[in-house]
Regions:
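ER/secretory pathway lumenal C-terminal domains and tails of membrane proteins involved
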Residues: 1-214
């Protein structure tokens, strides 16, 4: 472990951690929110004196080529945005959480620095937790397309953490799309016809989707 057993005493302040005489509390984001926010969101010029704020130069420039290594490194910045978002949600500061996610997309746009399917799913859920249903729907629409493509490619993928069945069920439940939920459970029933959990959920969604042909 490169943190030599001190991980519970390392507080995140940007792209660096500060060793502090305070142990992190379980399930809390151990960050310095004011410093982290300043580093991630403040626009700074050039100065001989210290000013907080990352420049993010060129990261939203469509004329610049980013290879896979660049894209992997950018996830360190995204991790900082996401930890600040989780902190705000934990504090009940949902507006700040949404603003932080919006700032991340502005500075590190997915269309240029693409995120993997699992991370997109997590971001959509953060918007939902923060009460931004419209933005949840926008992100989850993209996640849904990717999940359906994965399902088409490998319909037996039910074990991976981000397996398409779990993702689609979560999205459709959040959106109240019972007809689509029923389709997912019907597909699972063809793979696991004797599974009691599958059978129970299939019957439940049949009851919630009257008038739909379930034959």
């Amino acid at each position: 472990d490169s943190k030599i057993g001190l991980s519970d005493y390392l507080r995140m302040e940007g792209m660096a951690f500060r060793l502090v005489p305070e142990k992190r509390k379980s399930n809390d984001e151990f960050i310095e929110p004011n410093v982290l926010k300043a580093n991630l969101t403040e626009t700074v010029g050039y100065s001989k004196n210290y000013q907080p704020g990352f420049k993010f130069r060129g990261l939203n420039d469509s004329t610049i080529f980013f290879d896979d290594n660049h894209k992997r490194m950018v996830q360190n910045y995204r991790n900082a945005f996401l930890r600040l978002t989780l902190y705000y949600i934990g504090q009940g500061q949902n507006d700040l959480a949404v603003n932080t996610l919006d700032a991340m997309e502005e500075k590190l746009p997915n269309k240029l620095l693409s995120m993997d399917y699992g991370l997109l799913y997590e971001i959509s859920n953060l918007y939902l937790r923060a009460g931004a249903k419209d933005k949840f729907n926008r992100y989850s629409g993209e996640v849904e397309k990717l999940a359906l493509a994965k399902l088409e490619k490998d319909p037996k993928d039910v074990q991976s953490y981000y397996n398409p069945y779990r993702i689609l069920i979560d999205i459709y439940e959040a959106q109240g799309r019972n007809d689509k939920l029923l389709e997912v459970w019907q597909k699972l029933a063809t793979i696991f016809p004797a599974d009691p959990n599958v059978k129970a959920n299939l019957q439940k969604d049949r009851n919630l989707s009257p008038g739909i042909d379930t034959s």
